[in-house]
């Protein structure tokens, strides 16, 4: 049995909004700058996000605060699971320095789940966000927070940070 191919079919081009320019040099450049200011982690790198080049080329970055080790094991995420290190207070300055150095206008701050901390990391979210807003007032800050184990006080503290989007 032979199969015939209809050669009259029209080949459609992908719409412009679906096309993605891959700019690996921009990605490498931003990763090197992040290393230069203290080896910060981005969720883009840790979770092996397929859109990393797109975000970096648009001068957007999602910073992973509170380390790169999660206390939970979610099947959809590639972030390492284990016992995290203590909170790094110098991270606040490092994130803000990166925002200023890279000229970022939109920043997302997220973290792995930190069930080992009483507030789930809410105070660090507050401090990082406040510092960015204070030193780079034109930068919009979105925070993607963990569930803080349902702790209402932790959520209230994060809201007080003044983030543009929670």
Please name every model-derived segment.
Residues 58-166:
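Conserved Radical SAM active-site core
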Residues 1-72:
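Flexible, acidic/Gly-rich N-terminal and inter-domain linker regions that tether
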């Amino acid at each position: 049995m032979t199969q015939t191919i209809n050669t009259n079919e029209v080949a459609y081009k992908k719409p412009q909004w679906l096309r993605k320019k891959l700019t690996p040099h921009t990605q490498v450049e931003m990763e090197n700058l992040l290393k230069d200011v203290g080896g910060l982690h981005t969720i883009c790198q840790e979770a092996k996000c397929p859109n990393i080049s797109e975000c970096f080329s648009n001068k957007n970055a999602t910073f992973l605060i509170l380390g790169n080790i999660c206390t939970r094991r979610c099947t959809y995420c590639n972030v390492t699971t284990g016992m995290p290190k203590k909170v790094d207070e110098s991270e606040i300055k490092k994130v803000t320095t990166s925002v200023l150095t890279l000229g970022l206008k939109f920043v997302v701050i997220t973290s792995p789940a930190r069930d080992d901390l009483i507030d789930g990391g809410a105070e660090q979210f507050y401090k990082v966000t406040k510092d960015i807003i204070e030193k780079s007032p034109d930068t919009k800050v979105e925070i993607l927070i963990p569930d803080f184990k349902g702790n209402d006080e932790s959520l209230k503290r994060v809201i007080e940070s003044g983030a543009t989007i929670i």
